[in-house]
Amino acid sequence: MHYARIVSNLRLGYDIIHMAEYVTLTTNRKAFHNYFLEEKYEAGIMLLGTEIKSLRSGRVNMGDAYVKPQRGELWLVNAHISAYECSGHTSHEPMRERKLLMHRKEIVLLMSKVKEKGLTLIPVRIYLKNDIAKVELSLGRGKKLYDKRDTVTKRDTERELEREVKYRNFRR
């Protein structure tokens, strides 16, 4: 999987290959279903060499992932990064805890918000920013069952309206 685009430079007469600035590798779709997401934060992630290779090939699952504070640090737990198939016997453990890299002031601010307001810290997506792996964290408040039903019905009605408008425009 390559994330490049070719930009032609007519004046110089050659093509330049630019890597995309942001490449989303995976999103935590359960987070959007189970939480009202409020503020977003960016954190680096400490990975091994085989983990970044598996990440680039898209072999990651964040379905049950969460962030755990421990001794003034943030840890990503239950994120499954599959073993890299070309690594042989030196591969990593797929479900290991991975350290998240943020400034100390940001970590203290996040932990104070989590303690005060009853919010939780949820990993929303993993992406590459200038070829460096990053995790987008979000402060979220848990949804009740009726909130989930409301969002599903709103989404269904919006889809019906879009289909109807599309069908009307198509009939003309």
UniProtKB/Swiss-Prot annotation:
Gene Ontology terms: biological process: trans-translation
Lineage, opening ranks: Bacteria, Bacillati, Chloroflexota, Dehalococcoidia, Dehalococcoidales
PANTHER family the record matches: SSRA-BINDING PROTEIN, TMRNA-BINDING COMPONENT OF TRANS-TRANSLATION TAGGING COMPLEX
Compartments, record wording: Cytoplasm
Family annotation (Pfam families): SmpB
Similarity remark: Belongs to the SmpB family.
Gene label: smpB
UniProt-recorded Gene Ontology molecular function terms: RNA binding
Protein name (Swiss-Prot/TrEMBL): SsrA-binding protein
Signal peptide start and end residues: none
NCBIfam families in alphabetical order: PRK05422.1 (NF003843), smpB (TIGR00086)
Main location: cytoplasm
Single GO cellular component term: cytosol
Keywords from the UniProt entry: Cytoplasm, RNA-binding
